[in-house]
Amino acid sequence: MRMSTTTEIIAHHWAFAVFLIGAVGLCGLMLLGAYFLGGRAQARAKNVPYESGIDSVGSARMRLSAKFYLVAMFFVIFDVEALYLYAWSISIRESGWIGFIEAAIFILVLLAGLFYLVRIGALDWTPTRSNRRVSKPSTVRYASSHPQDISQELSVAGSQQANESR
């Protein structure tokens, strides 16, 4: 006598379903326990970063370049690929020539991705140069740091621009 498909699926996968329900239930139980048993003190300095007993100076937030995040993502990607190559190198005798060809194709795809990243400049850390050109290099002057000199230079530059526009 043959079982129906739903009964067959339940018979084969009941252990996984019990495991999944148990894992989700345990996570929920721990979250609820932390919510009910956790402290709720609201002090003035609760959210202030601790700096070895010294009063904090400035903000703890730093703006980082997006290139750092790109490098982190590239590291994770190439690290996972190295993991796959390590698994292949352990089973090289069992995989034979077919496994070698597949690993060679995998390495070629990695190299193509690396060359693409280099080509689009994702790994270039030098600052980009501005394409702006100064129209009249003779009018460029070094400004003084004294406030009176700066205001005089601005008024002279404004009158020169007004004369040029006429």
UniProtKB/Swiss-Prot annotation:
Question: What function does this protein fulfil?
Answer: NDH-1 shuttles electrons from NADH, via FMN and iron-sulfur (Fe-S) centers, to quinones in the respiratory chain. The immediate electron acceptor for the enzyme in this species is believed to be ubiquinone. Couples the redox reaction to proton translocation (for every two electrons transferred, four hydrogen ions are translocated across the cytoplasmic membrane), and thus conserves the redox energy in a proton gradient.
Q: Which InterPro entries match?
A: NAD(P)H_OxRDtase_bac/plastid, NADH_UbQ/plastoQ_OxRdtase_su3, NDAH_ubi_oxred_su3_sf
What HAMAP family does this protein's entry cite?
Answer: NDH1_NuoA
User: Which major enzyme category is it?
Assistant: translocase
**Quaternary structure?**
NDH-1 is composed of 13 different subunits. Subunits NuoA, H, J, K, L, M, N constitute the membrane sector of the complex.
Which Gene Ontology CC terms are recorded? Answer: plasma membrane; respiratory chain complex I
What residue ranges are annotated as transmembrane? 16-36, 68-88, 98-118
In the bilayer, the protein is annotated as: Multi-pass membrane protein
Per the record, the similarity remark reads: Belongs to the complex I subunit 3 family.
Do you know which PANTHER family this protein is assigned to? NADH-QUINONE OXIDOREDUCTASE SUBUNIT A (PTHR11058:SF21), NADH-UBIQUINONE OXIDOREDUCTASE CHAIN 3 (PTHR11058)
What keywords tag this UniProt record? Cell inner membrane, Cell membrane, Membrane, NAD, Quinone, Translocase, Transmembrane, Transmembrane helix, Transport, Ubiquinone
Cystine residue pairs: none
Which one Pfam family would you cite for this protein? Oxidored_q4
A molecular-function term among this protein's GO annotations: quinone binding
Where is it predominantly found? membrane
* Protein name (database record): NADH-quinone oxidoreductase subunit A
Report the source organism.
Answer: Yersinia pestis
Q: Does the keyword Transport apply?
A: yes
Give positions of region: Disordered. 141-166
